[in-house]
Amino acid sequence: MEEFKRDLELDRSQQHDFIYPLIFQEYIYALAHDRGLNRSIVLENPGYDNKSSLLIVKRLIIHLITQMYQQNHFLFSANDSNKKKIVGYNTNFYSQMIFXGFAVVVEIPFSLXLLSSLEGKEIVKSQNFQSXXXXXXXXXXXXXXXXXXXXXXXXXXXXXXXXXXXXXXXXXXXXXXXXLRFFLHAYHNWNSLMTQKKSSFSFSKKNKRLFLFLYNFHVCEYESIFVFLRNQSSHLRSISSETFLERIYFYRKIELXVFTKDFKAILWVFKXPFLHYVRYQGKSTLASKGTSLLMNKWKYYLVKFWQCYFYMWSQPRRIHINQLSNDSLDFLGYLSSVRLNPLMVRSQMLKNAFLIGNAFXKFDTLVPIIPMIGSLSKAKFGNVLGHPMNXSVWADLSNPDIMDRFXRXFRNLSHYHSGSLKKMSLYRVKYILRLSCARTLARKHKSTVRAFLKRLGVGLLEEFFTEEEQVFYLTFPKASSSSGELYRRRIWYLDIICINELANHS
């Protein structure tokens, strides 16, 4: 990582040539192929094959940029609307590799900023934070006092030009924005970035990493209003927000928008001492200690702010307010289902004969076994009743490859749900995948499951399903509003949609 940091240091006087010196360097393509900076094996996408040749990507981008300089536009030959080609190459095939390279290039400045902010600081790793389900349990001390939660569906997907302009503002490179805008307009699947459903938007499984980056970058602008309100209002003493990125010129822009559009006059209505915000996969959850009237004020304030400042139309009915005492807090898709339950602790004095009852609220993290079995059924690991089936499409692979694919699927699921106290559902998933793996191997060798396991031993499968892997933790340090000390928020598995198709069960 130090080598990358040293090689990627950019001179401010050369920022107008931001993309072009980087895009032809070999390690950029290596990073694009590995899908990230210093990713561990658990975050890798095993779906790559020999088609993703780094040399092909490099030659194609050089050819495209040469054509752009010579003719000032891209050449299209539209034989068919579904078979468009860019300078003779298939769009669907080569655009994936082009955008993978662009994604790494645009993420470099933010990765360097993260490294520079962490330089000289020791990162404290909590060993008990081993899954996303443990995140809610860790926040029980802060969010247990919250009474209401507002579930807001993200606004409609941004236009390609607006997303490119937002990235250009941070990169400060006009040439980079022009080249990126050309590729965005040439790509036809931008509208499939988010799939609209009845009450929310969800990311498509075929999304490109660059589009996810640009979308999160754009959404972060209007959701960062919570950070501004925390600093402006003395009533908002505590805020917890997990965002993808922070804008450089955020405070200047938001301050201008709030005070020129007469939003300051209504800041006094927000008197909640606790405010927690989290967003995942097109859904946002805002939890606060207060009444439903307070959450309704937040609801209409956010809608008005989005419409006036970002010119985004969002109807109030897309924001639902639930009481945490009656509803489960499920904001991470299949990752976790958190329920707030009351807990009574009784204490008895030693000398005096009376009891003291203390009421507490605690989080119970649940494993959504029914949606998970449905996802396994769609992936042909079993039927809708949870009975294992053999994966015939993998029967032609070698024995180690078959066991590795089944074990990788289980480790991905277990990584999220290991924070739950009730792991019986995980044992059921492990049973389905192990028996499905055994049936696939038995079909490959034209044998029965009993005979195959008797010949090789049950311990062989157990070894693959219990192997531990290193998990990459991405830590963002932020200044505390009270003491000035640094506190850190963890983000798990930002690329879950890219690596695990079982995540999109809904």
Swiss-Prot record:
Its biological purpose is as follows: Usually encoded in the trnK tRNA gene intron. Probably assists in splicing its own and other chloroplast group II introns.
- Hey, which family's this protein in? Belongs to the intron maturase 2 family. MatK subfamily.
Q: Name one Pfam family in it.
A: MatK_N
GO terms classed as biological process = mRNA processing; RNA splicing; tRNA processing
Please name the InterPro entries in this protein's record: Domain_X, Maturase_MatK, Maturase_MatK_N
Q: Name one GO molecular function term.
A: RNA binding
What protein is this chain from? Maturase K
Q: Which gene encodes it?
A: matK
**Keywords in UniProt for this one?**
Chloroplast, mRNA processing, Plastid, RNA-binding, tRNA processing
What superkingdom heads the lineage?
A: Eukaryota
Q: What is its main location?
A: plastid
Localization, UniProt: Plastid, Chloroplast
**Does Glycoprotein count among this protein's keywords?**
no
Give the coiled coil ranges: none
- Identify the GO cellular component terms for this protein: chloroplast
